[in-house]
C-alpha cells in the first residue's frame, strides 16, 4: 500500500474524490513549510520550493488507485509524483508541478484550496 497526500480536487467533497474509490482516508494533515501552492484556475498545484504549509488529506491507496490518480494527474508529464514532507514525520507522496513552467501563476498564500 502507498500513502498519497492530496490537496485539491482529490480531497473529500471535491469533484475528483471519487477517483480514490476504495482508498482509505487516514487523516487531514499539513506539510512542513517548504512548498508553494499556486492557482491554476480550476485546480491548484504545488511547487517543491517555498515557505508555505500546504493543507490536505492523506489516503492509503493500492497500486490500481495510484495508477488511476497518475493518469488523471498527468504523471509524469504534467504533475510529477514524489515524496512530500508532512507534519509528524508522515511519509506520503504528492503531485508537484515543475517550478520552471509554473512560477508565474498566482500564489495561494494560505496553502488551502
Which sequence ranges carry the predicted segments?
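Glycine-aromatic micro-motifs
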Residues: 1-113
Amino acid at each position: 500500500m502507498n500513502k498519497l497526500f492530496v490537496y485539491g480536487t482529490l480531497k473529500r467533497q471535491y469533484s475528483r474524490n471519487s477517483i480514490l474509490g476504495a482508498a482509505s482516508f487516514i487523516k487531514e494533515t499539513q506539510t512542513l513549510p517548504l512548498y508553494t501552492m499556486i492557482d491554476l484556475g480550476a485546480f491548484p498545484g504545488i511547487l517543491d520550493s517555498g515557505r508555505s504549509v500546504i493543507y490536505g488529506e492523506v489516503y492509503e491507496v493500492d497500486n490500481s488507485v495510484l495508477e488511476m490518480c497518475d493518469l488523471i494527474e498527468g504523471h509524469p508529464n504534467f504533475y510529477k509524483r514524489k515524496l512530500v514532507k508532512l507534519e509528524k514525520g508522515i511519509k506520503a507522496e504528492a503531485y508537484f508541478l515543475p517550478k520552471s513552467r509554473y512560477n508565474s501563476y498566482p500564489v495561494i498564500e494560505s496553502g488551502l484550496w
